[in-house]
């Protein structure tokens, strides 16, 4: 994720109360291995829980959050009412640049009866996918309407996340 220093000290603590524990740096596949790649001359990272945000870096150490025209964090994608990801969209493993675009896997959390997908339990975490434009990593080309991986086994529906999780 972005780390305590980034959130609490940078930007005068503007993002200190923003929940985020994971981030996905864009990679490519070279000789069967994931290798971090630049997009338009910068390293690019998707991050966030309540929305998918972005940050860029010249050196993989110092990250600049991508801001919108109001100087707020730019929301690249947000939860959707009525879908499995109606509560949050939490970035997962490294995003992968493919011939079709950038694939980002994420944990989608189902909301409650006010905004949920009734095909899944309230609060269930299911895995979703975004496809972003490889040259414009802010542009969503596609997004799954149904998760590709859902909690089914008993151990996925017990413990800390009794409603189910696959991350």
At which residue positions do the language-model features occur?
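Loop/turn-rich, solvent-exposed surfaces of beta-rich toroidal or solenoidal domains
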Residues: 90-149
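Short loop/turn segments that connect beta-strands within beta-propeller blades
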Residues: 58-61, 135
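Secondary-shell segments that build the walls of catalytic and ion/ligand-binding clefts
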Residues: 61, 67, 73, 83-106
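A short beta-strand motif characteristic of beta-propeller blades
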Residues: 10-14, 159
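Conserved blade-ending motifs and adjacent loop-strand segments that build the rim/top face
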Residues: 74-88, 138-167
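Short, small-residue-biased leader/transition segments that mark boundaries at the very start
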Residues: 2-6
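Beta-rich catalytic cores
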Residues: 19-22, 89-91, 125, 167
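Hydrophobic core segments of beta-strands in well-ordered, beta-rich domains
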Residues: 1, 22-28, 32-49, 53-55, ...
């Amino acid at each position: 994720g972005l780390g305590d220093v980034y959130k609490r000290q940078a930007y005068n603590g503007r993002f200190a109360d923003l929940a985020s524990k994971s981030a996905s740096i864009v990679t490519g596949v070279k000789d069967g291995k994931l290798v971090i790649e630049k997009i338009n001359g910068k390293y690019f990272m998707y991050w966030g829980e309540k929305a998918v945000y972005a940050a860029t870096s010249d050196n993989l150490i110092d990250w600049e959050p991508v801001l919108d025209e109001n100087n707020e964090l730019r929301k690249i994608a947000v939860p959707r009412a009525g879908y499995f990801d109606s509560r949050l969209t939490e970035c997962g493993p490294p995003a992968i640049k493919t011939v079709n675009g950038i694939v980002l896997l994420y944990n989608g959390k189902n909301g409650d009866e006010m905004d949920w997908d009734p095909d899944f339990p309230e609060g269930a975490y299911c895995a979703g996918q975004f496809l972003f434009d490889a040259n414009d990593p802010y542009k969503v080309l596609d997004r799954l309407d149904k998760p590709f991986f859902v909690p089914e086994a008993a151990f996925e529906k017990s413990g800390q996340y009794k409603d189910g999780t696959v991350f």
